[in-house]
């Protein structure tokens, strides 16, 4: 709230939308005042408490993504891209997929980052992030499918995020990658069930 504007009417905010804000002050805080050097270090053990705090309770990806939204909203696209890039730099040691940790809202934020990269004219960055997230989701889905009797909810949640990611990649103009994402997941189901989910190469 340190850069929010005081206005005489309701300021509509959400988890990834800070509403009205002084973007110059916001940029100053994010680039000059605040530091994430400790979070970005790779010489300490990231235990569950760190994961729970920085991916869930005080989501750092959520922070950077909401800042990027604020800049995008007022047309400051370069600043928006800078926030997303900084997020990836700072959070490089933290997992992209967190269904197994119980706070999958992080996965939603990563998909939103992919979508934003496309909107901001950075398709290569969007593609790289999408592939990395998908690989993690597919690996988790494969594990949960093996123990489907006990992990049906987790498997289905992974599937929901895979299809959500596929939609955002397709909306970003990456039809080929979207098709690969859908077909790979359907092939996993096909192998497990002996069905023909992926035999015709159709997308979901």
Where are the language model's segments positioned?
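ER/secretory pathway lumenal C-terminal domains and tails of membrane proteins involved
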Residues: 1-204
């Amino acid at each position: 709230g340190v850069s929010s504007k005081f206005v005489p009417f309701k300021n509509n905010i959400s988890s990834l939308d800070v509403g009205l804000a002084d973007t110059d002050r916001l940029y100053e805080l994010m680039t000059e005042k605040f530091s994430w050097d400790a979070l970005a270090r790779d010489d300490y053990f990231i235990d569950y408490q760190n994961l729970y705090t920085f991916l869930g309770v005080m989501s750092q990806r959520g922070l950077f993504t909401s800042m990027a939204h604020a800049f995008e909203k007022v047309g400051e696209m370069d600043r928006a891209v800078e926030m997303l890039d900084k997020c990836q730099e700072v959070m490089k040691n933290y997992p992209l997929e967190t269904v197994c940790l119980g706070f999958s809202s992080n996965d939603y934020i990563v998909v939103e980052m992919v979508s934003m990269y496309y909107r901001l004219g950075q398709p290569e960055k969007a593609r790289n992030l999408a592939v990395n997230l998908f690989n993690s989701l597919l690996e988790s889905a494969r594990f949960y499918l093996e123990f489907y009797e006990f992990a049906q909810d987790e498997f289905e949640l992974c599937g929901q995020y895979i299809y959500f990611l596929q939609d955002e990649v397709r909306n970003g103009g990456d039809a080929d990658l979207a098709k690969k994402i859908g077909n790979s997941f359907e092939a996993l189901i096909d192998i497990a069930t002996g069905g023909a989910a992926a035999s015709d190469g159709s997308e979901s």
